Amino acid sequence: MEQNTEKFSIFNSQFSILTSYFPDLTDRQKEQYAALYDLYTDWNAKINVISRKDIENLYPHHVLHSLGITHMLRFKPGSSVMDLGTGGGFPGIPLAILFPETHFHLVDSIGKKIKVGQAVAEAIGLENVSFRHCRGEEEKQLFDFVVSRAVMPLADLVKIVRKNIKKEQINALPNGLICLKGGELAHEILPFRNRAISKIGR
């Protein structure tokens, strides 16, 4: 009983942070985000998709970090986005909840991680997502944007996803790659210094 009370307290404090950043969430979106805590906690006990030391920080370190992309761009209805190296569904699933009229295609080379993402998406009733177990080099579809959370050096990532970017633009920003990375990036982004680069606090 005491353990359940502590778990609820952790969830409640973290979830309130999420809703403070996104006060206009619909009831449906709140339900979907709220369900992520138990779903990922349960799945993480079977398949390690999030550091077991970090699962209690699911909302600030994973959900909100994924939604940091909205600091740069709000996807227009009808947009298509590939999440490369999604792992258990980040940033794709949190973004798919927030943008129900955008399609998200989640790709990972590790099948068991895709299995977790599919199970979570099905459990919360996400209808604007698809999944594929493959390497990025194998995915040939075209998208408005590719998003990724630090799966590899930026130069390598650009080489892989360049083929996947549509030419026709419908969003406020030009089509391209949105990469969530931390640490010292000056050397890594130097070859792309003339591209749009924005710092997003975590």
Regions found by a protein language model. Name each.
Residues 2-5, 11-77, 82, 112-129:
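Class I SAM-dependent transferase core
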Residues 85:
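Conserved glycine-centered beta->alpha loop in an early N-terminal alpha/beta scaffold
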Residues 88-101:
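Conserved SAM-binding loop of SAM-dependent methyltransferases across substrates and taxa
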Residues 101-105, 109-202:
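S-adenosylmethionine
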